[in-house]
Amino acid sequence: LSLDNLVKSTIVALFVLLSAPVAMADEMSKEEKIASAMSAAPARISKDATILDADGTLLREGTNRWTCKPGGPPGSRDYPICNDPVFVEWSETVWQGKPFSTDVVGYSYMLAGGFAPDVFDPDVEKSDAGANAHHEGPHMMLIMPSHDLLAHLSGDPKDEDIFVVFKGTDYEIVIVPL
């Protein structure tokens, strides 16, 4: 495993941990999981979205281009998320250790908020969260076709309302608080 692939795998693992609850409690019913997933985005998006469980199991087939996943039990730091196809492709491509590029903007909603163990270092695991950990309230995330478009934005949530997670890496994501 090359260092580049190790970094990519770690970043994607962190992203998945932030956005998809890998430790979903079995006590949540299918209906509760669907309701949790739908809470991630505005109703006009989530009402027709495909809903996947944390492990990728189809909970509900959708009719629009969005895919949503439920959050975990309260206190788990796992939050519901809804992604457009670009964000889904980014997650899958980087997870596979492949390069990613896009000509269009990718969108993701996390209206219940989210948690990053470290906004600067994509290698930090949830269990190792420290001084750079950050909880963000309701927000959306953007993947941009060019990192040059983000040069004017801070990589520190303490500096700006809108900021870039993993600033200076190939995995920059814009966080837009709502």
What name fits each language-model region?
Residues 19-20:
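N-terminal signal peptide c-region/cleavage motif recognized by signal peptidases
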Residues 26-178:
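Primary mode marks residue(s) on the alpha4-beta5-alpha5 output face of response regulator receiver
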Residues 23:
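S-adenosylmethionine/decaboxylated-SAM
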Residues 1-11:
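Bacterial N-terminal signal peptides that target proteins for export
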